[in-house]
Amino acid sequence: MPGFTCCVPGCYNNSHRDRDLRFYTFPKDPTQREIWLKNISRAGVSGCFSTFQPTTGHRVCSVHFPGGRKTYTIRVPTLFPLRGVNERRSRRGRSRKVSAVVPIITSVVSTANETAPLEEDEEEGDIENTTVVQIGQNGQYIAPVDLTSSGDGSCITAVVSGGEESAVHESCSVADFALCGADHSYSLTTGTTSTELLRKLNEQRDIIALMEIKMKEMKNTIRQLRVTEARLQDELRQREQERERLICANTIIKRKL
């Protein structure tokens, strides 16, 4: 697509398509330029733009400026709809997801180290009737485990004694569930897929922007070569004409002699 494309990660505004927007070049002032690079999260990008230095071909659209336009008072872009590649993902969203799951889990299960204490006068027969059910990653129930077997208390278990539900501690913290099962093979990874996808998307956009710049440079080179070729052909034509004139003049002189 012709025209300028905004170099902000996640922004695809183009000067040819979005004619109502304005596109600004990076400031020449080193301080302002550094602030711009820090705000748009370009500094430190891996890939072909790991040492990103903006040129006249890199523009920032007016969407990222408060008020939709760069002015004397508003000189730095601060509005970004998508998170940059260098910004860490906020942990607030993760805590909300965990807290939303906690009430459901705490209503039926409790950790092994927080199970209801047995009464001292309870007989051994009651203990033998106690079964432990492990809950897998997708919420399915695994085969019951004998209560007498030793456990490290790192997995979530549901204890059913004599057909009655065990007491559940409602004060179980979110951190207990976040840390629970961290050492198991079925524990969830801490990496976020969206961040990786955004990083790869930014790298692809950087490659496309670099190729567009290279194509413009090659077009300018081809245009200059064509102009040079036409000039050389003109000079060659003039030399051929001068050569023909000299030959004609020599022929006339020989005839006179």
UniProtKB/Swiss-Prot annotation:
Keyword terms of this UniProt record: Activator, Coiled coil, Cytoplasm, DNA-binding, Metal-binding, Nucleus, Repressor, Transcription, Transcription regulation, Zinc, Zinc-finger
Listed under GO biological process in this entry are:
regulation of transcription by RNA polymerase II
Keyword field contains Cell wall biogenesis/degradation: no
* Organism domain of life: Eukaryota
User: CDD domains given for it?
Assistant: cc_THAP11_C (cd22291)
GO cellular component terms, alphabetically, are: cytoplasm; nucleoplasm
Summarize the record's disruption phenotype note.
Morpholino knockdown of the protein results in severe craniofacial abnormalities. At 4 days post fertilization (dpf), morphant embryos do not develop the major components of the viscerocranium, including Meckel's cartilage, the ceratohyal and the ceratobranchial cartilages. At 2 dpf, knockdown animals also show structural brain abnormalities.
Q: Give the matching InterPro entries.
A: THAP_Znf (IPR006612)
Mention one GO molecular function.
DNA binding
Principal location = nucleus
Give the UniProt family note.
Answer: Belongs to the THAP11 family.
Q: What protein name is recorded for this chain?
A: THAP domain-containing protein 11
Recorded source organism is Danio rerio (Zebrafish)
